Regions:
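Outer membrane beta-barrel
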Residues: 23-35, 44-169, 182, 191-198
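Repeated loop/turn-to-beta-strand initiation elements of outer-membrane beta-barrel proteins
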Residues: 24, 63-69, 100-104, 157-160, ...
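Transmembrane beta-strands of outer-membrane beta-barrel pores
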Residues: 32-38, 75-79, 109-111, 164-168, ...
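Residues that define the transmembrane beta-barrel architecture of outer-membrane proteins
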Residues: 43-53, 87-90, 142-146, 182-186, ...
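Gram-negative bacterial Sec-dependent N-terminal signal peptides
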Residues: 1-23
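Detector for outer-membrane/organellar transmembrane beta-barrel domains
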Residues: 181-293, 298
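Outer-membrane beta-barrel "beta-signal"
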Residues: 265, 294, 298-300, 312, ...
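Outer-membrane beta-barrel architecture
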Residues: 11, 56-58, 93-95, 149-151, ...
Length: 354
């Protein structure tokens, strides 16, 4: 009898992991680059960068023919350094999906952030558009804590996303008078993909007690394949920064319009030339900036690609931005003497998706 119980226990222990892991997959991205960065003033150095490298687990489970459960746990991984924070939470959530669409809860990219996708030719590389769109306290390319999101089913290529971040941090905080802080955010987008066209239109708003202050923005991005080899992209964003605790100068500095155009041309089935020009028009005087970037990308196979980019960012006299600050571990701030200067960067990168 005892031997039978042991055999049953061992068999159960071996069977449970097999069942639990049946619909779970491991995925990731190793993305590194060697960069030469020059802020036009005092900083001119070669860096090795880990560019939004990640490791994740995701899975789904059919509850019944009309209802599925799904989850994802994703962490950022830093290659080339050991600074005590080599893992940082990226898109992590759990949810349900069915004919009604999908609902999920967790911490993940907002619909506004995702909406840049159609025009995102240089994501997580030198020349990333977020160097102009995600600036100062008015930034909106975020993943928010404690978020609930609903995604509609596909309707002829269209879908919509609506997300609400209930509060920042682990719980709702109180002010000095015992009142709840307004630290919630709301984001929504309308998206289309069909034939040669991919496009997104998004709106986002953050309340006054969020860590960066009250702000709202509108974003539009589109990509159109003129031929099988050539794709044209366009982008527009307007941000209004209304933080009551900020000075008039700060509100004008972070309130801005950003727009640009670009293109990708395949010179071979696995090789593409890319270029993008963007400009940031701020309300503050002498705080505008222009960025242009050119690059070539070659896919060694479906999983591995190499690339080289060159990017330049021209600053007005009251600003000191650069083309390397976003999506990368090598993101040194421009020096104090870089106001009004031209910052440039050259990068050679390797990306392996698995």
């Amino acid at each position: 009898m005892k031997k039978k119980l042991i055999a049953i226990a061992v068999g159960a222990a071996m069977a449970v992991p097999a069942v639990a892991m049946a619909d779970i997959s491991i995925y990731g991205r190793a993305h590194v680059s060697v960069d030469f960065l020059d802020d036009g003033a005092d900083y001119s150095e070669t860096n090795l960068s880990s560019n939004s490298s990640r490791l994740g687990f995701k899975g789904d489970h059919q509850i019944n023919p009309n209802l599925n459960a799904f989850f994802q746990i994703e962490q950022e991984v830093l290659f080339g350094s050991d600074n005590g924070s080599s893992f940082n939470t990226r898109d992590t959530f759990v949810g349900l999906s069915g004919n009604f669409g999908a609902a999920q809860i967790g911490r993940f990219d907002s619909p506004f952030k995702v909406a840049r996708g159609p025009a995102n030719l240089f994501g997580d590389q030198v020349g990333d558009m977020r160097n102009l769109t995600r600036v100062g306290d008015a930034r909106f390319d975020e993943r928010y804590d404690n978020t609930i999101q609903y995604t509609t089913p596909d309707f002829g290529g269209f879908n919509a996303k609506l997300a609400y971040s209930v509060h920042e941090g682990q719980s709702v905080q109180l002010d000095d008078e015992g009142d709840a802080l307004d630290s919630d955010s709301m984001s929504m987008s309308l998206n289309y993909a069909g034939g040669p066209l991919e496009a997104s239109l998004a709106y986002e708003q953050a309340e006054e007690d969020t860590s960066r202050g009250e702000r709202d923005g509108i974003r539009a991005a589109a990509a159109y394949k003129l031929t099988d080899a050539f794709k044209l992209v366009g982008f527009y964003q307007t941000i209004e920064y209304d933080d009551a605790d900020a000075s008039d100068l700060e509100r004008d500095l972070w309130t801005s319009d950003v727009y640009g155009v670009g293109g990708e041309y395949k010179i071979a089935s696995n090789t593409a030339l890319k270029a993008m020009w963007m400009t940031r028009d701020a309300d503050a005087d002498d705080a505008d900036a222009d960025m242009w970037v050119v690059g070539v990308e070659h896919k060694l196979d479906k999983a591995v690609r190499v690339y080289a980019n060159y990017a330049v960012l021209d600053n007005d006299d009251a600003i000191r931005m650069n083309p390397w600050s976003q999506g990368r571990s090598a993101n040194p701030s421009s020096s104090d003497d870089a106001f009004g200067e031209q910052a440039s960067a050259f990068t050679v990168g390797l990306r392996y998706d698995f």
